């Protein structure tokens, strides 16, 4: 499982590392992951464009991004917190899958989504997907 940095997932960025520290929970890794997920879901505005334009750091700074860039930010924060996390790709959509005691599908692009339980109201498909260590487009 992966916690490493990739092209748009800037795990080694000092600002991302410092920011991720603020989400650590004394209740454990699952609560830390939920804290990170809900912050991204509630604070990063969705923008509609194709592919990646920003990466994790710029998405954090601008507080906006499409599904790819929101996935980059969420993966970077989770990996920085030591949580192995994959990118998931379904029909025309990307989201994240942190692996703690099991795999949790986490899509921060809509405030109706819950940690580990995204719905399909954006037109993507969370039921048919593939997992990836990186997203490089």
Predicted regions located by residue number:
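Hydrophobic/aromatic-rich core segments of domains that either
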Residues: 69-136
């Amino acid at each position: 499982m992966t916690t490493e940095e990739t092209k748009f997932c800037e795990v080694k960025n000092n600002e991302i590392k410092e920011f991720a520290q603020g989400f650590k929970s004394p209740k454990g890794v699952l609560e830390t992951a939920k804290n990170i997920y809900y912050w991204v879901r509630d604070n990063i505005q969705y923008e509609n464009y194709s592919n990646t334009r920003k990466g994790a750091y710029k998405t954090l700074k601008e507080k906006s991004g499409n599904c790819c860039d929101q996935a980059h930010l969420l993966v970077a924060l989770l990996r920085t917190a030591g949580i192995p996390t994959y990118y998931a790709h379904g029909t025309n959509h990307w989201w994240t899958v942190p692996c703690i005691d099991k795999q949790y599908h986490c899509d921060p692009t809509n405030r109706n989504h819950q940690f580990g339980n995204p719905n399909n109201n954006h037109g993507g498909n969370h039921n048919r997907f593939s997992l990836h260590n990186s997203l490089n487009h």
